[in-house]
Regions:
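Outer-membrane beta-barrel pore domains and translocons
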Residues: 69-75, 99, 125, 147, ...
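Sec/SRP-type N-terminal targeting helices
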Residues: 42-43, 59, 102-130, 180, ...
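Short sequence motifs at beta-strands and strand-loop junctions characteristic
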Residues: 86-90, 295-297, 398
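Periplasmic alpha-helical coiled-coil/stalk elements that build and connect Gram-negative outer-membrane
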Residues: 108, 124-239, 350, 354, ...
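Short flexible linkers and secondary-structure junctions
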Residues: 1-138, 274-279, 312-319
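Hydrophobic, lipid-facing positions within transmembrane beta-strands of outer-membrane proteins
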Residues: 92-98, 140, 239, 299-305
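Terminal intrinsically disordered/low-complexity segments used for targeting and assembly
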Residues: 1-36, 92, 116, 200-245, ...
Length: 440
């Protein structure tokens, strides 16, 4: 970890648009659609809004509750009771009730803070989902481009094998090659054609995956065909400590930990008495014309103090439950941090190793191409049979495909590294507790 490079100001990526580092307009356009049209992100955004409303609900408990009910009751007493009865009466009521629970011990305030911190965690989870789907799209895109590279390679190979088939056919017609040479060349050509056709399946699957990530029907998207034209650009890594502020999943677990801590305080408040104030006032009359009049008024007001005398250990268990839940969030936070460091280190190593592997594979392709040229020359001179040519052709194609695959893996690893670093996200993007409570 200590070997990470210190990020310089010029290293910074455009905030929120880390994919622009690849300088690919088509990728840029697809990435822009993820935030707008991805249905999983729409669900995560709705969950964040739900969490914000939960904050408002918790905050409403800080204020009195006022209710009013208008009623008209027509009643007749039983004529067989000992008490005077049998008469019929109508009662008109318009009571207004006010109830208020004083937050003496801060339990309601803690509930508001816990809900707000949970909403912050929900926002961080939304941003983590956004980063995850953006990275998934970029990986699918480069896998598709890698498939395009293999297709282009096989198309060139098919043309080359057609020329070799013509060469063996001409030599057979001139009596200097056997029919086996022609059959082998034809088999080699047919195999390459089959491989080329098979790549269409993989390409279609990557195209369908991109369509779904951008909120489209799988068959409705068509991505132009061209191979990867760049090598992985340098990714600004920075210092390990900065990772704690750059990953939204770390921010989410930290906020969950804060919310769980507030729940411990809420559980402890149950040990103290609850003070509430009740007020009832309104108008009541048995005569409609006198209902809305000053003499019909009534009111009652008074405080109430409630304390649990015995609960068989319920409150103690609730505190223990809240403490255990908090301990779980602490462990989850630590594990998330460790996993984040691992992901960064894994992809840094992958990029370094794959770069060396790419250089070695390029040398192998050059050597295989030279070997094929020599075998072809020797075959034309009649010093070797066609099997030697086929062997060198297979080695060259294998090395060329491997070179394309390594480049694809390098691009994918660079995307995974950016994702592991949190993209362009920063903890400063979290909404404040006040903003969450006010719905901004």
């Amino acid at each position: 970890m200590a070997s990470w490079k210190q990020a310089q100001p010029s290293d910074a990526l455009a905030r929120g648009k880390w994919w622009e580092i690849y300088n690919d307009p088509e990728l840029n356009a697809l990435e822009e659609q993820v935030s707008v049209s991805n249905q999983n992100l729409q669900a995560a955004e709705a969950q964040f809004r739900e969490a914000r409303y939960a904050v408002r609900i918790a905050r409403s408990n800080l204020f009195p509750t006022v209710s009013a009910t208008a009623s008209i009751t027509n009643a007749r007493g039983s004529g067989t009771m000992n008490a005077p009865s049998g008469g019929q009466s109508t009662t008109y009521d318009l009571p207004v009730d006010l109830s208020y629970q004083a937050d003496i011990w801060g339990g309601i305030q803690r509930s508001v803070r816990s809900s707000a911190e949970a909403a912050q965690a929900s926002f961080a989870q939304l941003e983590n989902a956004r980063l995850s789907y953006q990275a998934e799209l970029a990986q699918d895109y480069f896998e598709l481009r890698g498939t395009d590279g293999e297709r282009e390679l096989l198309e060139t190979t098919v043309k080359s094998y057609q020329e070799y088939l013509q060469l063996t056919q001409d030599r057979f017609n001139n009596g200097v090659a056997s029919g086996a040479d022609v059959a082998q060349a034809q088999t080699q050509l047919n195999t390459a054609r089959a491989q080329l056709i098979d790549l269409g399946v993989a390409r279609a699957q990557f195209e369908h995956a991109i369509a779904v990530l951008t909120g489209q029907a799988p068959a409705s998207l068509s991505v132009s065909s061209h191979p990867i034209k760049i090598t992985p650009p340098p990714v600004p890594v920075g210092v390990p400590s900065a990772l704690l502020e750059r990953r939204p999943d770390i921010a989410a677990t930290e906020r969950q930990m804060a919310a769980a801590n507030e729940q411990i305080g809420i559980a402890k408040v149950a040990y103290y008495p609850a003070l509430s104030l009740g007020l009832a006032a309104g108008l009541e009359s048995t005569q409609f014309l006198k209902w809305i009049s000053w003499p019909s008024r009534f009111w009652s007001v008074g405080p109430a103090l409630a304390e649990t005398v015995f609960d068989a250990g319920k409150r103690r268990a609730q505190v223990g439950q809240a403490q255990a839940a908090y301990d779980a969030t602490v462990a989850n936070y630590r594990q998330t941090v460790l996993t984040a460091f691992q992901q960064v280190e894994d992809n840094l190593v992958a990029l370094r190793v794959l770069e060396k592997e790419a250089q070695a594979e390029d040398d192998a392709v050059t050597a295989a191409r030279n070997a094929l040229e020599i075998s072809t020359y020797q075959y034309k001179a009649g010093t070797v049979n066609y099997l030697s040519v086929i062997t060198e052709q297979a080695i060259l194609l294998q090395d060329q495909v491997q070179a394309v695959n390594i480049l694809t893996r390098r691009m994918s690893s660079s995307v995974l590294l950016i994702e592991a670093l949190g993209g362009c996200w920063n903890a400063s993007q979290l909404p404040t507790l006040q903003d969450v409570a006010s719905g901004k």
